[in-house]
Amino acid sequence: MKEIILATSNPGKIKELEQLLAPTICIPQADLGISDAEETGLSFIENAILKARHASSLANKPALADDSGLVVPSLNGEPGIYSARYAGIKANDEDNIQQLLSKMADLSQEQRQAYFFCAIALMRHAKDPTPLIATGVFHGLISVKPSGTNGFGYDPVFYLNEYQCTAAELPAKIKNRISHRAKALNQLRALLPD
């Protein structure tokens, strides 16, 4: 695919997707005047399909959507599909991180296990009855305080034992090789015809 609509307005996701999808030409939906789809699904996969179908129908082109978030099993899967608005509709990344750290304040290291989950949906056209779906998982733990300035979202509190740092302290080159989004996109590439 030479050109694809990115069904997101999240600048962090756009930057990562553009890097990971190169040399494909990526057009953020906002560049075409397309607003975000309402995320009414109950799972990451449902929301990715809703967003990709919305962008594809309005652009009349193939569209790719990523719905991803942080899952903390000891919090019954929170923040989950509500990761971007965990501390409220108008919350920013720092607000969401503080909400998470507050809820986890008394948890042991073992209870701080977490993972990022990414679902990617590719609609080849708006009425695509068989969208391509790929998923990726990125395991780590939630640190007790934020550290690092790279990345976005919960990266400053997502600690990676293997690298002895948070995802926000990793160089983009490494993160773009090991993250949930990178794993999902690699899976998607394997589904695409040559």
Curated annotation (Swiss-Prot):
SUPFAM superfamilies: ITPase-like
Entry annotated with the keyword Oxidoreductase: no
Domain of life from the UniProt record: Bacteria
InterPro entries: dITP/XTP_pyrophosphatase, ITPase-like_fam, RdgB/HAM1
GO terms for cellular component: cytosol
EC number: 3.6.1.66
A molecular-function term among this protein's GO annotations: ITP diphosphatase activity
Record's keyword terms, sorted: Hydrolase, Magnesium, Metal-binding, Nucleotide metabolism, Nucleotide-binding
List of residues binding Mg(2+): E38, D67
Catalytic activity: XTP + H2O = XMP + diphosphate + H(+); dITP + H2O = dIMP + diphosphate + H(+); ITP + H2O = IMP + diphosphate + H(+)
Pfam families: Ham1p_like
Biological role: Pyrophosphatase that catalyzes the hydrolysis of nucleoside triphosphates to their monophosphate derivatives, with a high preference for the non-canonical purine nucleotides XTP (xanthosine triphosphate), dITP (deoxyinosine triphosphate) and ITP. Seems to function as a house-cleaning enzyme that removes non-canonical purine nucleotides from the nucleotide pool, thus preventing their incorporation into DNA/RNA and avoiding chromosomal lesions.
Description of how the protein assembles with itself and partners: Homodimer.
UniProt cross-references to PANTHER family, sorted A to Z: INOSINE TRIPHOSPHATE PYROPHOSPHATASE (PTHR11067:SF9), INOSINE TRIPHOSPHATE PYROPHOSPHATASE/HAM1 PROTEIN (PTHR11067)
Entry's family note: Belongs to the HAM1 NTPase family.
Name of protein: dITP/XTP pyrophosphatase
The species this protein was found in: Legionella pneumophila subsp. pneumophila (strain Philadelphia 1 / ATCC 33152 / DSM 7513)
